[in-house]
Amino acid sequence: MANGSDTKPVPKGPRGARADDTRTPPHPDRRGSDRDQYFSKDRSYGGRTDRDYSDYDRAYPPPRDYDRYGGGKYGKYDKYDKYDRYDRLDSHDYPPRRDRDYDRSRDARDTDSRDYGRLPPRDTRPPPRGGREYRYARDERGWDRDRRDLDRDRDRDPRDRERDARDRDRDRDFRDRDHDPRDRDPKGYRPHSLDPLPSRDRDMPPRERERELVRERDLFSRDRDLITGVRELARSPPPPLRDGRNRDRSNDRHDRSFDKHTRDRGTRDRDTKEKGSVISTPQTAPTPRLTPTNGKPDLPTSQPPAPPSPPRLKTFPKEVWETVGRKNNTRLTYDPELSKDKQKGKRGIYEEVKKGASTTEDPRSKHPHYFKTSSKSNKKPYQRLPVPRFLYDANSIAPPPSTQIIVKGLSSLTTSKTITAHFKTYGELEAVNMVEDPATGSSVGACLVRFKVTKNNYEAAHECLKKAIRGQKTGRIDQAKYRVEPDEDGAKAKDIIKRVAARAAKKAMPVKQPPTAPAADKSIMEKLPTPVPSARPSPKAAQLMKTSAYIFIAGKYLPSEKVFASDIRRILRDFGWFDVLKEGDGFYVFFDNNRDTVECYEAMNGRKVNGHQMAMAMIRLSRVAPKTKESEENATEQAPKLPPKEEARKLIVQELANSLRKDIRERVIAAAIVEFLNPARFTHIKQDPEPSAATEPNTVNASAARVDTPEPVQSSSAIPGFLPRFKIKRKGDPTKKKDATKKNRKKISARPMNHVLNDYYSDEEDSTRMSTPIVPDTSADAAELPIRKPRKKISQSKQRIMDFSSSEGSNESEEEEEVEDDMEEEEDETAQEELQEASTLDTSQQLTTAFGEILDWAPAHGFPQPVTADKKGGALTTISGFQALVKDDEDMELLQEALEGIEPEKINGEAWTWTHKHLNEAVAKENAEFPELAAPNAFVNSTGSWKSQGYFKIPEAAKSEYLPHRKKLNIPIDTLQMENREKKKENASNSRVNRANNRRLVADINMQKQLLSTETDVLNFNQLRKRKKPVKFARSAIHNWGLYAIEPIAANEMIIEYVGEVVRQEIADLREARYMRSGIGSSYLFRVDESTVVDATKRGGIARFINHCCTPSCTAKIIKVEGQKRIVIYASRDIAANEELTYDYKFEKEIGEERIPCLCGAPGCKGYLN
């Protein structure tokens, strides 16, 4: 050997014991022989190989079952590994190998450990030279320990080591909790490197290293204040008791202290332990133990009397009571031992218990399945019995299970049909109701779905509800996810509506209040008297004064050349006026109600406009006058208050629309009606007798009057919201001469524009719309214009001037553009002949004949001669008669000379002339249309005055003789007789044959549906279309347009279906309000049921033109056709040809302003529609 020793190592047992069990300690001179036997002197391998370690293996063989149990470092006998002796050197670098995890946090922080309690796998070869495993080999201090001490430590029982070990928790050196248990050895000690069988317990920490759950010092720190108080309290006597009955038993024991010997337990007080409170019983000094001198216990002897107790105090110290009371009347809300919160600190937090507070409940009672399992038994403990669930039936007291759900997260465009199709897969549905915004009527993205309950089986419907809730995870509606929640009473839907309304109210802009005007000067106000209208107002102002509140502003304080109506509108723009009119004596400002009138008067009276002060007179609307027919026709629906920009834009658009309507009416529609009403096309109609010469105005005079007077486009009897009634004024021209000026000639545009009326599809025939180009095409217009023949001689009896005037005002609504043209487009044979004859004319002749006639006159030569004969009789007092006196420029010059000395008034001459001529226009039209009824002789009063005769009732039959609308009711309209009466009636069939044919047609369609697998558009054709009667719409004597029967209709026959756009009730209400604001006087809304309305205002058939009558000829019924509700008009009696169709609107009865006058004129007329 290296040290010169020839002794071989003695083999040892499996636990490190020697084979001979002699345990003879080695000679001191031989220490370290084992180390030098296998290592070189430089403490390294020295280039040795595995063969050099074979002697060591023979000296310390492993047990026989080494290979049987796996062997190696990770087997049963890992300590016998041949390289295990080298692993002992790095015990401080790797965690110890142990069976259980003693310190998990320590092992988790060790980055070198991959397996808790195990070393990572090593290479089978020795570690490299100079590795860290041998860094302690160079330290001589680890090899100076005696081998006997090593053997003793190795063979020592672990329990003895635990017994002799120091208490690390109590020792100051081991107070640190993060102390590594593997560093328990002194720094100078190192284990022997060649110890073949080191003790496994060497690397194990002692059991005292475990941290105690409850330590004495923790208890002391937590209850330090309590213990201090108790100790102080123990030194003082308790307070006196209230009575003797409630005396503590501990006091009785102290009173009988000399009856028997007290048991001494040292310093422990038995009374304190029994009672559990140191406050109730005072502590006494312990009795000393008597011990005999011989060391044996002696019999008990009498004890000397105890020293007297200190006198009792009447009251405790204040600080003691505060300390004890705070602890006894409080409860612990924060325990630092149970929850570690750095913000709350390490001390407990107490809360004072108030009187009358609710007792503390066991938190386990809130959890029905709370239980404590036993760690010793694997058997599942018995839980609480399940509560039985009973099925709902008629005898159940509890409410039924929920069957309604609310679907959220939907798109606002999602319809109820889509939701129905989706949730039908979960069960049969009873109702699907969309949650709608009450303000707009649109969906808010939610829907209520209720499952159907059949035969009181609520459980089945509830199961469908559960399926729908479970299906929301994967289901989608319109490619979007949705949420489903039970909502039996609809409370969640109401909450959604409230949130939507609150959001809309929040977004709404606050209404700006009108600026407060500065107070006017009272001195000036007192000086200005209340103005009074002096002149007679215009008809329009007079009519508005009857039905509206208004303010009159005197014109004598406001010069007309400096203040205009636009200035008044600008100053009063913040108030709710709807019209401002300028009259001769001042301005009239009209309001809808008295409140706006009072506000305007109080704020603006005395204010200055362009430097001039306003003097106002307020006239309130005290009583609403009963509406007459004329007032009903002139009443217009006023738009709501708008901002100034919106109002200006609306006014501009309205004026442009009125101008456009006027141009279309005068240039397009007039020409179309002229061509359509060509007398050549109505030769079979009876001609009216020619008017007398006294009633026929002079053609030249009328033309001259139109030169200085603007063309009237508005009538006082206008009915807003409907198409104008075009009338023909037949005016003869017996004094027409060739010397008439070319300047006064009226050109008539003759372009046919029948397609303008055809804005919507007719219900009788399918036709495509005809559009009017924006930029007119001259060539196309010229081609469409009918070219007239040149006439060599025109008889005076046939010469006429077609003057067209509209009975509508400038407030005509869109209804004018929505009238259907159900008239057939056919070409007149006469027009074709004229076109063929005109093809030979040159271009100049075509243009001349297209736009006007060539009058028979030539330029005059020489001195001027009178062109017309003077009209005999006195001078006329009307504007037209006065204009008739002026024939030419010479007459105008003479008139000017005659009026030189008269100072003209400062008025607008054109407006004044137009107003006065416009007053009698309606009467002139009636006289021109019915000249024989203009002055009926049947009711000429003998006295010459109607006032002198008094009031008398005129019979209904007599009214039909002279009233125009009554006469129209009795006499069929001639325009309905346009059809060729020469057509043979061989194809006519009675109503019974028609019904039979219709039934056969319907049966054939149903048979084809059954034969074909799929339905086509042809089979889905509306069946009612084939059953309708031939009807036409035309001007009605009752109101605007009406529907007329072309052929006789028998009673109880179906006439036509009321077709329109099907909308909900909420949408219908909004549309009705919009129609009224836009000026559409009539809205064609027909209610089908409580939630469905048919709107035929803009999309509908000609059935919407049926008027109301108190004695109707038709009735409306709602029938079902293939599951859909239809509105059908049936004949209630036999209807003759060309008779107007009417039915009762059946409006609800109302009173006051809401009543609508009835214009049917029937003998049984009620007077009002409602």
UniProtKB/Swiss-Prot annotation:
Residues 278-294 have a biased composition (Polar residues). Residues 17-188, 198-226, 242-276, 316-325, 337-365, 731-742 have a biased composition (Basic and acidic residues). Residues 403-489 form the RRM domain. Residues 1029-1146 form the SET domain. Its EC number is 2.1.1.354. It is an enzyme of class 2 (transferase). Its main location: nucleus. Keywords: Chromatin regulator, Chromosome, Methyltransferase, Nucleus, RNA-binding, S-adenosyl-L-methionine, Transferase. Residues 1154-1170 form the Post-SET domain. It catalyses: L-lysyl(4)-[histone H3] + 3 S-adenosyl-L-methionine = N(6),N(6),N(6)-trimethyl-L-lysyl(4)-[histone H3] + 3 S-adenosyl-L-homocysteine + 3 H(+); N(6)-methyl-L-lysyl(4)-[histone H3] + S-adenosyl-L-methionine = N(6),N(6)-dimethyl-L-lysyl(4)-[histone H3] + S-adenosyl-L-homocysteine + H(+); N(6),N(6)-dimethyl-L-lysyl(4)-[histone H3] + S-adenosyl-L-methionine = N(6),N(6),N(6)-trimethyl-L-lysyl(4)-[histone H3] + S-adenosyl-L-homocysteine + H(+). Pfam families: N-SET, RRM_1, SET, SET_assoc. S-adenosyl-L-methionine binds at Y1145. Residues 1-382, 625-646, 687-843 are annotated as: Disordered. This is Histone-lysine N-methyltransferase, H3 lysine-4 specific. The RxxxRR motif forms an adapter helix that bridges the nucleosome and ubiquitin. Belongs to the class V-like SAM-binding methyltransferase superfamily. GO terms for molecular function: histone H3K4 methyltransferase activity; histone H3K4 trimethyltransferase activity; RNA binding. Component of the Set1C/COMPASS complex. InterPro entries: COMPASS_Set1_N-SET (IPR024657), Nucleotide-bd_a/b_plait_sf (IPR012677), Post-SET_dom (IPR003616), RBD_domain_sf (IPR035979), RRM_dom (IPR000504), Set1-like (IPR044570), Set1_fungi (IPR017111), SET_assoc (IPR024636). Residues 302-311 have a biased composition (Pro residues).
